[in-house]
Amino acid sequence: MNLATTKAKLKSGAQAGVQALNKAGHAAKTGTVAAGKATVAGAKSLYLTIPKDYDIEKGGSLNELIKAADELGIARLQEDANNIESAKKSIDTVEKLLSFTQTGVAVSAKKLDELLQKYSSSQLAKSLGSSANIDSKLTKTNHILSTLSSFLGTALAGMDLDSLVKQGDASATDLAKASLDLINELVNNISNSVQSIEAFSEQLGRLGAAISQTKGLSGLGNKLQNLPNFGKANLALEMISGLLSGISAGFTLADKNASTEKKVAAGFELSNQVIGNVTKAISSYVLAQRAAAGLSTTGAVASLITASIMLAISPLAFMNAADKFKNASLIDEFAKQFKKFGYDGDSLLAEYQRGAGTIEASLTAINTALGAVSAGVSAAAVGSVVGSPVALLVAGVTGLISGILEASKQAMFESVANRLQSKILAWEKENGGKNYFENGYDARHAHYLERNLKLLSELNKELQAERVIAITQQRWDANIGELAGITKLGDRISSGKAYADAFEDGKKLDGASNVTVDTRTGVVDISNANGKKTQALHFTSPLLTAGTETRERVQNGKYSYINQLKFNRVKSWTVKDGEANSRLDFSKVIQHVAFNDEDGRLSGKTEEIALNVNAGSGNDDIFAGQGKMNVDGGTGHDRVFYSKDGGLGQVNVDGTKATEAGSYTVNRSINNGSFYHEVIKRQTTQVGKRTETLEYRDFELKRPEHGYQTTDTLKSVEEIVGSQFSDTFKGSKFADIFHGGDGNDTLEGNDGDDRLFGGNGDDHLYGGNGDDLLDGGKGNDVINGGDGNDVYISRKGDGNDTLYDSHGSDKLAFADADLSELTIERTAQGIMIKRNDGSGSINMAEWYKTLSQQNYHGNATDDKIEQIIGKNGDYITSEQIDKLLKDKQTGTITSAQLQQLAQENKSKSIDSGNLASTLNKLIESMASFGSRGATASNYLQPAHKSPQNVLAPSAV
């Protein structure tokens, strides 16, 4: 760094100082200017002047002052006619405390002694002179001299810096050493906060003593001797004692009892503990100067000084530092729960917060102290000939120092960040190259398992599976991301990590679980169920899309960097199942990616990620996700559910083109509510002036304006469950099993022996050809079995259904009612079967229509059900009904008559084979899948016990 660069960086901070120094020269008399120049050019010492006729050997009231000066290293100067008299004439300081000489600033021992005696009884003098509270070795006189020395020493040190800048040949190293020497003393003394007048005076005394001993900036202290140049900020910080250690413990704002949050508001005082005491201390100090100089210390003057100091103190400047210390404490507490899992990154983050807080606190305290002193001295200088140039000098010095500090600030932050980076890289080297931030995700997941182990262990019972595979996506972690940004390692972090944990019999498997979740290739393999017959694949959180991430750290401004994400995405997930009866729930797998435009905002463009499911053997239940799904059910009885949480939108199932059983095309709408979308987000971390922006993948719930349309392909799927919307099912030429779920659905079996369950809603069920089983469910349904020997199921609460039938030997079974609980009434061209409790009815309006008539589906029908069966197997026939009602316009078959007819049938021989087939259909339907539970529940349904005596054949 050359001098020109250094001067440019200091220009803004030094400008005020140079202007103030120039004003000081013009404001004083000619003698003052000459004396000031001589002081700058000379040794610039502080002297204690002793009257020429004072005899030290004989002793007197001044001996105490002389002894104190000797202890403090303040030179004694015996008055003579030459230098003292000329000084008095030139700057008009007759009978004043302070005066300039050719070799420095003189303090009149005589005048000081008089002032001490004059004000010895005042509270102010007692405060300034309470040496016992500071150091038992210092007398009151010693302490006051130390205070004066400290203030003037600070000013003289600033003049040294100014003279270096003006020389034009000073090196950057000299400037850095000068500024850092001042920083060192201010940080170690002032930044710990001022709690009393005595402490403030003591700190200034030490500061002045250290700087006043500096001669020509050649010997700047042992701590900075090895500083090679200004650019080596790391070493510079380490050389500054206490900057990065110790201060946070002593700094008042770090104390949780400082009440910063309660006492701070924009434009108001920080708190009495901090700024109040600083104000009191500096006010008392400058008032003492005025008293010592013989100036007024009235209440009005004191108020002016206090007001000036308060205006120089910014409460909000302290808040940033206070927040960092507070955050560090919170992060430290947060870090404890992850340390036992081998991750210390949160502690590193807290370490940075403390370091940054220390820097902010130190520099804020320095600038606050300098600004307050400058303001106080300026206020105290009112009415003082000597005070005015001194005040201007102090203002100039503080402006210059502030500029130097600001130029050094970024290097301080980077030193802390670089130290943390070194720790991270050292850890990776010690741990075989493992990624430090990935280790952070591992610790987060281990903590998640520990905290939620009880709930996770209950999944076996909840999902009714001997084995549960829980897949958890640890998403982007702000703390881990912030640490990566601070340490300039943002290109080494990932957006998260997916984990698979196996639970068997309520216990987590600690060893190998025979599960593979490869987020790079998009393969999830759970085909080895570890000998268990039932298992469930459960996603505890939304799973990000598969692929490979890379990042590149690019500079996009002087202090600005962006870690750009590049993602090679796999277009689908593949899930492999094995022999177990598995429950595969994909409702939390993210299947839509939302893209951003060049400005980082969502563009509205999306990409769909497919799910390929190879279910293997076993009876599997597959819950559809939020996007395209290709399912191969394999062997076994497999079911696909579109009913999870009510479903995502309307489902249209089409099996009309199937060439093999279980093959369907499902066109569905995804427009109900909000869906998971993978998005690119950004996190920005501030390190002083440097900003680090990290791009990462995350997910959000979004509701697209028009929704999505997608198409699923199902193969070897035996059963499909619809949504809460109005779904359409069209069966194949094979046996189909459809459940409408909620909504007003349309189910058509077409060919094959189909099972159609309407579920809730006003549904239309049409069996078509084949021996079908039709269950309308709740709602007012329209049901037509079509050709074949069909079975209709009715339950309590099903609503008022309309039933059509054509051809075949058909049966209507009341699963929960005896015939004695029913009544049959004649209608215009048909009959109405009513439940006596009013819970539902079945209207067969075309029972008596001829075959020339057509039903609503356009097919001819005789609309008669050959047998009506009660829950205990009692039955009546269509012929028995016709005998009682055919030739009547109105009429009723009572419950008693129905019971009598059923009793007569018990002694008759019936077709046991036909009845057994009907019985099997009903039992299988009720035992393997309860239509109520199937459409409403998200989980496997427990097998119902076979209904006793339902359709049981009578003894023959």
Curated annotation (Swiss-Prot):
Region annotation Cholesterol recognition/amino acid consensus (CARC) region 2: where it falls in the sequence: 340-348
Spans annotated as Cholesterol recognition/amino acid consensus (CARC) region 3: 444-453
Compartments it resides in: Secreted; Host cell membrane
GO BP annotations, alphabetical order: killing of cells of another organism
Record PTM: Myristoylated by RtxC; the toxin only becomes active when modified. Mainly myristoylated; a very minor fraction is acylated with hydroxymyristoyl, lauroyl and palmitoleyl chains fatty acyl groups. Fatty acylation is involved in binding to host membranes and promotes the irreversible insertion of RtxA into the host cell membrane.
Cholesterol recognition/amino acid consensus (CARC) region 1: annotated span: 280-287
Main location: secreted
Location of region: Cholesterol recognition/amino acid consensus (CRAC) region 2: 349-354
Name the record gives this protein: Cytolysin RtxA
Originating species: Kingella kingae
Disruption phenotype: Cells lacking RtxA display strongly reduced virulence.
GO cellular component, as recorded: extracellular region; host cell membrane; host cell plasma membrane; membrane
